[in-house]
Curated annotation (Swiss-Prot):
Organism: Methanosarcina barkeri (strain Fusaro / DSM 804)
Biological function: Part of ribonuclease P, a protein complex that generates mature tRNA molecules by cleaving their 5'-ends.
Gene: rnp4
Source superkingdom: Archaea
Transmembrane segments: none
Enzyme class of the recorded protein, top EC level: hydrolase
Similarity remark: Belongs to the eukaryotic/archaeal RNase P protein component 4 family.
EC number from the UniProt entry: 3.1.26.5
Cofactor remark from the record: Binds 1 zinc ion per subunit.
Stated name of the protein: Ribonuclease P protein component 4
Molecular function GO terms recorded: ribonuclease P activity; zinc ion binding
Gene3D superfamilies associated with the record: 6.20.50.20, Immunoglobulin FC, subunit C
Amino acid sequence: MSRIARKQQKNLIQAIAIQRMWRLFELAKSEYAEHPDRSERYVQLIRNISMRNRMSIPREIKNRICKHCYAFLVPGNNARYRLKDGYIVVSCQRCGKEMRYPYKKLK
């Protein structure tokens, strides 16, 4: 297999992996209300896909997953979002850890 063909195949595999991660994320959002354990499983599958293909999870998905216990975070249910000193502070209610994401203040 030539170098170009391998590169095209890798790009195709990564595109499929990203599609699957987004689909699992949408399923996790919709299933959380009735089956929170299913949404935890979907998060686990997202992580497995990203590790298997050695690619990062998209930022929008990554911000909704606890970095410590890998719980699916839903604002108001199992996560608390606060704005503090230029950061969004997300507190996981399951493990008690906090994640901080910077944001730009409007001038």
